[in-house]
Amino acid sequence: MQRNQFLVSSIVGTLVAAAGNTFAMPPDILQPFYLPPAPPLEPGPGGLDIRTWVRSTQTNNQFSCIEAAVAPKTMGPPPHLHKALDEICYVLEGTASVLVGDKIYEVQAGGFHLRPRGLVHTFWNASDKPLRFMDLYFNQNFEEYLEELFHQIYADMAKQNLTPLDPTIAKRMAALDKRFGVTMFPEQRQAIVDKYGLK
């Protein structure tokens, strides 16, 4: 009899504990969040700027996204590739010229474009109107790369009147690229600037 009572107590205890855990939220379960609207982003002093919307820390490193603003006739980054990052661009305003390999895509407002990992790519604004787009990143905290580049390295360059060729700046940028698996091809940039009359 005591054995039966022990078994019943054990089973009931296990079921109660399991039922209690049904409503517990493990730390890796995503929580809902809301992001209110914000005024459109304006290009910064160098003709580009970024603003983070969704952080990778909010999505267990599954997803993040930023808004980018590019002034008219402005070149984006040098051609580059990502070792492990796929990017999706959604254009909010204007037209993004996106180079992947040797093909150029003209992505108008409302259009999407995928830039897969391992392919050399860049973008620019060839028009006389502002360009704004959202960049979506998967399985990498790439918003942190951009925040460090735009809001720390570029900010320090402006304060100290330095260029990317300054040894201190070049070292910081190379370390940042290495940390995030980015390979730059700066020697390919000027030909694009010259061909499309960009800044």
Q: Could you say what each language-model-derived stretch is?
A:
Residues 117-144:
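Ligand-binding loop in jelly-roll beta-barrel domains
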Residues 67-71, 81-98, 136-137:
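Short, conserved beta-strand element in jelly-roll/cupin
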Residues 102-117:
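Short acidic-glycine-tyrosine-enriched beta hairpin
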Residues 21-53, 199:
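C-terminal segment of N-terminal export signals and the immediately downstream linker at the start
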Residues 71-75, 110, 118:
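Tight coil/turn sites that cap or link beta-strands
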Residues 1-14:
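N-terminal secretory signal peptides and thylakoid transit peptides that target proteins
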Residues 152-199:
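Acidic/histidine-enriched, glycine/proline-rich intrinsically disordered or flexible terminal extensions
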Residues 42-79, 85-86:
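A short glycine-rich, His/Asp/Glu-containing loop-to-beta-strand
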